[in-house]
């Protein structure tokens, strides 16, 4: 398949993929299978000639013939490497002229399809070639001629290839849903944009995507990844329908955007009061004549970074924690730099969303940044404030991402049998497709 998500244009670094995926031949087979009932409905409509304009209220039936029963005996999709798809359909009809035995008819359709990307960036499935054949299952010559006459009146073959891709389950609607705008938080959204038409190979259909993030409707210019993302060759024995790939840069850009949106500006409660803190830092007692609860106000002083290693994901955070008292008039008397050099991340998938939770802060250091109460040793800072920082910062970040992050997906399908595999620099998400119950 080659590099799936290689850097497309080094002159324009903003046109670099950070995620993508491949729909496997097994996934194509599943899409074909669930399209059968839909194809039968469409064929019932398209195989009939247009009803003549008349004022009669009596039911219309061409040439005294009952409308046919339609059964899609087979529908399949296969990849034509470097070209597109081949669609095959076998349709069985039973046409019943009045007062005669129903006549079996078989229609075979072979169509070549391809995907184009329009100037607006939307992908569209189009027909390259289509070849329908119609055959009446009659052994006698006289019956065959009669059958052909009836077929010409009943079966409108010309309509079959006008838009044969619509026999699949709303393919262009599904392609458009890939690039919908998805919410992350109430004022933060993400959108996946196709960088080029998909690549067709024996492994399936590969599509590279770039994620754009918005805050309050404005696109956030995220930092450019120093290393272009490319997806490795996939195992030929995969039993998945779809394999998604998300780069380390994708996750870092997500946290960068949330930080720019102010989502990680947090208030951390503390068990301390000004009186108890004055026992450790004596100058606090001179600032407050009454006992007030201590509050920690934290914000990121630089952008967070996600690090993906083989088998694990971690988050690096660099915060400034302002320590003070007073509500609603919060006044800080101490500022601390909190460097979280490793916070474990847990990744999972629910429906079509990536769920991200901060498991535990494994390594953190506190140091004095500014003080109105004299010099405070780092050891004392950690004794007083490290525990609430390590407990409350992950909880706050988990709450921000509690709804999960929408993965690239087609609107009529959900993901099942999902396995999230963390590799160095990227995450693979092999899964199977399942038609939503509202569409089944």
Curated annotation (Swiss-Prot):
CDD domains membership: BPI1, BPI2
InterPro entries named among the record's database cross-references: Bactericidal_perm-incr_a/b_dom (IPR017943), BPI_fold-BPI/LBP (IPR051660), Lipid-bd_serum_glycop_C (IPR001124)
Keywords associated with the record: Developmental protein
One GO term describing the cellular component: membrane
A molecular function GO annotation: lipid binding
GO terms classed as biological process: response to corticosterone
Pfam families attached to this UniProt entry: LBP_BPI_CETP_C
Induction remarks: Down-regulated by dietary stress. Significantly decreased expression between days 0 to 5 in egg whites of eggs laid by corticosterone-fed hens (at protein level). Decreased expression at day 14 in the magnum of the oviduct in the corticosterone-fed laying hens.
Gene3D superfamilies: Bactericidal permeability-increasing protein, domain 2
Tissue expression: Expressed in developing retina and brain, but not in heart, liver or kidney. In brain, located in a narrow strip in the boundary between the ventricular zone (consisting of proliferating cells) and the intermediate zone (consisting of postmitotic, differentiating cells). Expressed in all major regions of the developing brain, including the myelencephalon, the mesencephalon, the telencephalon and the diencephalon. In the developing retina, expression is scattered across the retinal neural epithelium. Expressed in egg white (at protein level).
Positions of disulphide bridges: none
Function noted in UniProt: May play a role in the developmental transition from cell proliferation to cell differentiation during neurogenesis.
Protein name: Protein TENP
């Amino acid at each position: 398949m080659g590099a799936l998500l290689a850097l497309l244009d080094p002159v324009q670094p903003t046109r670099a993929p950070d995620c993508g995926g491949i729909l496997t031949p097994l996934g194509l087979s599943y899409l074909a299978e669930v399209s059968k009932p839909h194809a039968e409905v469409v064929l019932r409509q398209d195989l009939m000639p247009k009803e003549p304009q008349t004022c009669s209220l009596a039911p219309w039936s061409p040439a005294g013939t009952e409308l046919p029963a339609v059964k899609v005996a087979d529908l399949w999709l296969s990849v034509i490497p470097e070209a597109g798809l081949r669609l095959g359909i076998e349709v069985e009809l039973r046409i019943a002229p009045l007062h005669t035995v129903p006549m079996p008819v078989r229609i075979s359709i072979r169509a070549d399809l391809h995907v184009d990307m329009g100037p607006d960036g939307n992908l569209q499935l189009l027909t390259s070639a289509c070849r329908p054949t119609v055959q009446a299952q009659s052994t006698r010559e006289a019956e065959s001629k009669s059958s052909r006459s009836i077929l010409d009146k009943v079966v409108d073959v010309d309509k079959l290839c006008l838009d044969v891709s619509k026999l699949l389950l709303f393919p262009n609607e599904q392609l458009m849903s890939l690039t919908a705008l998805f919410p992350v938080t109430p004022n933060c959204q993400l959108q996946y944009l196709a960088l080029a038409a998909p690549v067709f190979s024996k492994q399936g259909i590969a599509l590279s995507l770039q994620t754009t993030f918005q805050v309050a409707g404005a696109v956030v210019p995220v930092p450019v990844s120093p290393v272009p993302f490319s997806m490795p060759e996939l195992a030929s024995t995969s039993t998945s329908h779809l394999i998604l790939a998300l780069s380390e840069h994708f996750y870092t850009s997500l946290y960068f955007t949330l930080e720019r949106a102010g989502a990680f500006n947090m208030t951390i409660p503390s068990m301390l009061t000004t009186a108890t803190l004055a026992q450790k830092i004596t100058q606090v007692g001179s600032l407050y004549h009454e006992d007030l609860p201590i509050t920690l106000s934290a914000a990121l002083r630089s952008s967070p970074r996600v690090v993906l290693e083989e088998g694990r994901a971690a988050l690096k955070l660099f915060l400034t924690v302002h320590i003070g008292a007073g509500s609603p008039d919060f006044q800080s008397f101490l500022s601390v730099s909190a460097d979280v050099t490793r916070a474990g991340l847990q990744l999972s998938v629910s429906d079509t969303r990536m769920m991200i939770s901060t498991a535990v802060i494994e390594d953190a250091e506190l140091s004095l940044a500014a003080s109105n109460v004299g010099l405070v040793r780092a050891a004392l800072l950690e004794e007083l404030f490290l525990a609430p920082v390590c407990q409350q910062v992950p909880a706050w970040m988990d709450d921000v991402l509690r709804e999960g992050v929408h993965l690239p997906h087609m609107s009529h399908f959900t993901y099942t049998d999902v396995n999230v595999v963390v590799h160095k620099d990227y995450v693979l998400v092999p899964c199977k497709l399942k038609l939503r119950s509202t569409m089944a």
